[in-house]
């Protein structure tokens, strides 16, 4: 049976966390520097444990004002300290809750910049490996970040998006554009099935680009996140595709 992971961003101050954890197989737990706090992180970890959902850390630039979505240029040593701080916090709360932090997925601008910047990708990979070499790194399918992570000996998870539109180079349409988001569940389902079954994703210029789909992301702060997750699970099941983090 074909398998796919379904992941969601949590502990970002949204009301959907508990509902989504009944529908997904992996949870990207906010580390407190773009949103959330220690209590929301703790609750998200416990809820994930209750639902047998795999837990990953979701670190960002220190940018609460812009939800971590603004590009920043930090000195390498400062950014490493920022990442160690965030990963250490989530790992400690996971340890205290009797669960394992299994992977890392950068957030927002950090994610998008590292997808194209080899130096930034290497800094992230080195930091993650220093925390725990068994951690996997989740990133945009086909991105430089995943290639660099593998060069550093890390296992990787190729991520695709149900609720984002794509450019011809395989990158995401910037959120500053009006056509960045997939706004209805019918389009999201069509895009997901094409990615999982055909290994391609439609682009905004009318073409298609090849991708590898290990994990599908839904944004927990999205207005349609719960609706998307329910439909996606149902449609995947009907196609004989198992939603699981065991990939």
UniProtKB/Swiss-Prot annotation:
Its EC number is 3.5.2.9. Gene3D superfamilies: Glycoside hydrolase/deacetylase (3.20.20.370). It catalyses: 5-oxo-L-proline + ATP + 2 H2O = L-glutamate + ADP + phosphate + H(+). GO terms for biological process: carbohydrate metabolic process. Transmembrane segments: none annotated. GO terms for molecular function: 5-oxoprolinase (ATP-hydrolyzing) activity; ATP binding. Keywords: ATP-binding, Hydrolase, Nucleotide-binding. It comes from the Bacteria. Belongs to the LamB/PxpA family. Forms a complex composed of PxpA, PxpB and PxpC. Catalyzes the cleavage of 5-oxoproline to form L-glutamate coupled to the hydrolysis of ATP to ADP and inorganic phosphate. PANTHER family: 5-OXOPROLINASE SUBUNIT A, UNCHARACTERIZED PROTEIN YBGL-RELATED. This is 5-oxoprolinase subunit A. The lineage of its organism: Bacteria, Pseudomonadati, Pseudomonadota, Gammaproteobacteria, Pasteurellales.
């Amino acid at each position: 049976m074909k398998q796919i992971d379904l992941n969601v961003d949590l502990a970002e101050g949204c009301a959907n966390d508990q509902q989504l954890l009944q529908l997904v197989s992996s949870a990207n737990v906010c580390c407190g520097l773009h949103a959330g706090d220690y209590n929301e992180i703790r609750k998200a970890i416990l809820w994930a444990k209750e639902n047998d959902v795999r837990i990953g850390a979701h670190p960002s630039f220190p940018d609460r004002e812009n939800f971590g979505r603004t590009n920043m240029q930090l000195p390498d040593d400062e950014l490493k300290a920022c990442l160690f701080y965030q990963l250490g916090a989530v790992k400690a709360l996971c340890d205290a809750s009797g669960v394992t932090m299994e992977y890392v997925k950068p957030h927002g601008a950090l994610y998008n910049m590292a997808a194209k910047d080899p130096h930034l990708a290497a800094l992230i990979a080195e930091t993650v490996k220093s925390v725990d070499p068994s951690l996997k790194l989740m990133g945009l399918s086909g991105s430089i970040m995943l290639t660099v992570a593998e060069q550093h000996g890390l296992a990787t998870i190729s991520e695709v998006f149900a609720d984002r539109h794509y450019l011809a180079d395989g990158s995401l349409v910037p959120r500053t554009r009006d056509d960045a988001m997939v706004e209805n569940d019918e389009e999201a389902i069509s895009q997901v099935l094409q990615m999982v079954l055909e290994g391609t994703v439609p682009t905004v210029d009318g073409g298609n680009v090849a991708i590898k789909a290990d994990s599908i992301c839904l944004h927990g702060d999205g207005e349609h996140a719960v609706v998307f997750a329910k439909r996606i699970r149902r449609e995947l099941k009907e196609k004989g595709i198992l939603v699981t983090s065991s990939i």
